[in-house]
Amino acid sequence: MGPTSPAARGQGRRWRPPPLPLLLPLSLLLLRAQLAVGNLAVGSPSAAEAPGSAQVAGLCGRLTLHRDLRTGRWEPDPQRSRRCLLDPQRVLEYCRQMYPELHIARVEQAAQAIPMERWCGGTRSGRCAHPHHEVVPFHCLPGEFVSEALLVPEGCRFLHQERMDQCESSTRRHQEAQEACSSQGLILHGSGMLLPCGSDRFRGVEYVCCPPPATPNPSGMAAGDPSTRSWPLGGRAEGGEDEEEVESFPQPVDDYFVEPPQAEEEEEEEEERAPPPSSHTPVMVSRVTPTPRPTDGVDVYFGMPGEIGEHEGFLRAKMDLEERRMRQINEVMREWAMADSQSKNLPKADRQALNEHFQSILQTLEEQVSGERQRLVETHATRVIALINDQRRAALEGFLAALQGDPPQAERVLMALRRYLRAEQKEQRHTLRHYQHVAAVDPEKAQQMRFQVQTHLQVIEERMNQSLGLLDQNPHLAQELRPQIQELLLAEHLGPSELDASVPGSSSEDKGSLQPPESKDDPPVTLPKGSTDQESSSSGREKLTPLEQYEQKVNASAPRGFPFHSSDIQRDELAPSGTGVSREALSGLLIMGAGGGSLIVLSLLLLRKKKPYGTISHGVVEVDPMLTLEEQQLRELQRHGYENPTYRFLEERP
């Protein structure tokens, strides 16, 4: 047989598949060719982006991309167009073209750029000159504008800016938020646009600023504008007193003042000025216990009064209350604007009812905020008075302890006396500043409380007179400390005479004619039933400590010997000597007085025989309404022959 041709040999054999080692390179080549022909830009969605959100992106000279709603991957334009997506109006048109089923109404540029891999710009080859790019996409948003809800982590602050005369892009508003946070030493945590005025144009921005990760404790950011800083949970700020006097509520409320500590006791011993041991307690508690702690200033002020200083707590609560009010008003205004845009086709009566509904919501909101303000002020006033009383009580206790030393040391007594006088002067300043504030916001109310304020200042001076009268028990010590005491009293003396000078427009001529306000609605002041019973008064006296009994006596007693005499209290020291009574008239008056006295004694003896257990009055005692509470206590104590145990203790000492 002759040799057969290759065709004949091929026809005689069956076809066999190529070996397996040849299939693997062929499949890889086919896959690479498909990727090159399709020219896909594989951009993995970032963690911050939802997989199915409608977005578009484009760079000049490269294929325009859009995001697939099902897979979340970036796909090239089906028509292989190359658009420069710079104008928001053109971006809106392209979004409507790529997502016709979503009814796109607006676009918004993303806050940060995202990476794009293998964006090769339509090349048929499998290689890219620049395989990686970063582009800022545009969000294609359907429906009306709704502001993004921002989360405020613990230690961060929520702020916002509105500029009705400027219509800027979202990128510019985002930059403004970053600059505002950076100016306070914070970093931007999140931002959202407010008040749209066009396609990707807005009149405001809301943002959240947080402390840097390297410094998680926000107490180091005390410097700066108090309206945007994170408030610490301890310590006091310098100069806070002036801030509180300026930043008062707009409505006439009774604001109170807590003075930040000043360098008043530089001469005191170092061990007496030790810092409180509980300054770092809140930090330790927050780390150990998993219970969430309130971050709002109002909740912290009402819920944890010991965690923060009174002055800082009141300022922070007042500021956070106003911020909360602004957030709630902005939310209501957004809902009102959305409802108004949706009700354009409704009848006029329905639209008017809708407006009245939102107006009632705003009015209710203002009433709630006003109630919170009043509650905040009342709580602050109560705590201020308690702080002042505690400071004065502690200072008085130290002064009594220094006097009871054996022998009393002049330096220690002077130091304790200085602390006590400063506590009393602080109460005087607080009373005057409160009166000045009320006179500025409500002159009528200030005129009504004028008599009470002057009486309170007189009581403070009487209390100082009685306390300094204790020095008479040691004449040598009183003579030695007399010059220093005079300097302390004259250095910063605030008495009833300062009341006229504290309010502009007041005259000193009205001081003598000052009368208590007449009010028909005020009920007559009555003493409690137990005040007339000797047994109940003695039992109540046993429950009091010697210091409390002394304070009651000092608050209601007349001045004794004291080197400082106020001209506003002791007005009758120089009696006129030009008046006199004839001898005949004097003898007649003495005879009539003796006869009347004998009748009174006889009547008392008869009544005592009828009532061997004494008189116990269970009725209402008529009290002169001109008397203050301290003067009423003075009369009642003098009726029962009350003696100060402190005086007796000092007099019976050897």
Swiss-Prot record:
Q: Which residues of the sequence carry a binding annotation for Zn(2+) 2?
A: 565
Matches recorded under PROSITE patterns:
APP_CUBD (PS00319), APP_E1 (PS51869), APP_E2 (PS51870), APP_INTRA (PS00320)
Q: Which residues bind Zn(2+) 1?
A: 206, 209-210
Q: Is-annotated flag, keyword Zinc?
A: yes
Provide Cytoplasmic-side residue ranges.
608-654
Q: Which residues bind Cu(2+) 1?
A: 174
Q: Which residues cross the membrane?
A: 585-607
Q: Where is this site: Cleavage?
A: 624-625
Compositional bias (Polar residues) spans? 529-539
* Region ranges (GFLD subdomain): 50-146
| Entry PTM | Proteolytically cleaved by caspases during neuronal apoptosis. Cleaved, in vitro, at Asp-624 by caspase-3.
**Record motif Basolateral sorting signal, residues:** 608-619
The subcellular location is: Cell membrane
Q: Cite the domain annotation text.
A: The NPXY sequence motif found in many tyrosine-phosphorylated proteins is required for the specific binding of the PID domain. However, additional amino acids either N- or C-terminal to the NPXY motif are often required for complete interaction. The NPXY site is also involved in clathrin-mediated endocytosis.
More about this protein:
Binds zinc and copper in the extracellular domain. Zinc-binding increases heparin binding. No Cu(2+) reducing activity with copper-binding.
Q: What does this protein do?
A: May play a role in postsynaptic function. The C-terminal gamma-secretase processed fragment, ALID1, activates transcription activation through APBB1 (Fe65) binding. Couples to JIP signal transduction through C-terminal binding. May interact with cellular G-protein signaling pathways. Can regulate neurite outgrowth through binding to components of the extracellular matrix such as heparin and collagen I. The gamma-CTF peptide, C30, is a potent enhancer of neuronal apoptosis.
* Family to which the UniProt record says this protein belongs: Belongs to the APP family.
Under what name is this protein listed? Amyloid beta precursor like protein 1
Q: Which organism is it from?
A: Mus musculus
The organism's lineage?
Answer: Eukaryota, Metazoa, Chordata, Craniata, Vertebrata
